[in-house]
Regions:
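Short, surface-exposed "cap/lid" segments of acyl-processing enzymes
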Residues: 2-27, 32, 36
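Short hydrophobic segments within beta-strands
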Residues: 7-11, 64, 88, 148
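Short beta-to-alpha linker loops that shape the active-site pocket of alpha/beta-hydrolase fold enzymes
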Residues: 31-39, 91, 178
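Alpha/beta-hydrolase active-site loop
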Residues: 39-55
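Gly/Ala-rich beta-loop-alpha elbow adjacent to hydrolase catalytic centers
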Residues: 64-69, 73
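Aromatic pocket-lining residues of Rossmann-like dinucleotide-binding sites
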Residues: 76-77
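The alpha/beta-hydrolase serine catalytic core
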Residues: 81-163, 167-201
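N-terminal low-complexity segments that are often proline-rich with Ser/Thr-Pro
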Residues: 205-231
């Protein structure tokens, strides 16, 4: 059975972005997942249903997920559905991100608990339900994963991404000067090379289903306290 690659886009993205990855996975069927979920509780049903159907017709399923698409995948998928994952600028700690946005909007936890939802000037709506959900449903991830992270990512700190990497035994590659959104010619070339240098060609795959990497940032950090409840 063939290998299928499923691409999960980020906010305001499109399943059509999967076209870019067909050249990077030439011997695989590449599918863009046109999902509608806006929250992890919605993604739990939608993502598991879609990936279960795809899993039935392939020998190996590889996930490529971007930004919030990575977080929704983390919240809803497991090793029975996905064999390997590539995360691009992933949101890996939604609780921390929500707390950061509350600080940016000068909203206290008590105020959010009272009002339940508070719109912000930067286009996001703070949700008490969302904050409570991610606290009550910590991510559990056992899938071999490689992460591409921009050094200047404004949504996820270096400390947070390193902690997730260490906790989940993932491989982290950092693009110096890179942003959360990989879109410039230089950034896309870096992204393409990151995938190409890790795709199994004539190399011997390791036990995790990846070829031995041509390069690795080796960025590691302690993960102590990653999942304790944060104070917003």
């Amino acid at each position: 059975m063939e290998e299928i690659v499923v691409y999960v886009h980020g906010k305001d993205g499109s399943a059509q972005e999967a076209e870019h990855y067909k050249a990077l996975f030439p011997n695989c069927e590449v599918i863009g997942f046109d999902y509608h979920a806006q929250s992890p509780w919605e993604a739990t049903e939608e993502f598991s249903g879609f990936f279960t159907a795809v899993r039935k017709r392939c020998g190996k399923l590889t996930l490529v997920a971007n930004s919030i698409g990575a977080f929704l995948s983390l919240s809803s998928l497991n090793e029975k559905l996905v064999d390997a994952a590539y995360f691009i600028s992933p949101v890996v700690d939604m609780e921390q991100l929500i707390c950061n946005m509350m600080q940016w909007a000068d909203v206290s936890e008590a105020e959010l608990a009272e009002k339940l939802e508070i719109p912000t000037t930067f286009g996001e709506t703070l949700s008490w339900k969302y904050l409570c959900y991610v606290r009550e449903h910590p991510v559990s991830w056992k899938i071999p994963t490689r992460i591409l992270y921009g050094e200047k990512d404004a949504l996820t700190s270096m400390e947070t991404i390193k902690a997730f990497t260490e906790k989940n035994n993932a491989e982290l590659t950092v693009m110096p000067g890179g942003e959360h959104w990989f879109h410039t010619k230089e950034q896309m070339q870096f992204l393409d090379n990151w995938i190409k240098n890790r795709r199994p060609c004539n190399e011997t795959e390791n036990k995790d289903g990846f070829a031995s990497p041509a390069y690795s940032s080796g960025n590691r950090a302690g993960a102590d306290g990653l999942r304790h409840q944060k104070s917003c």
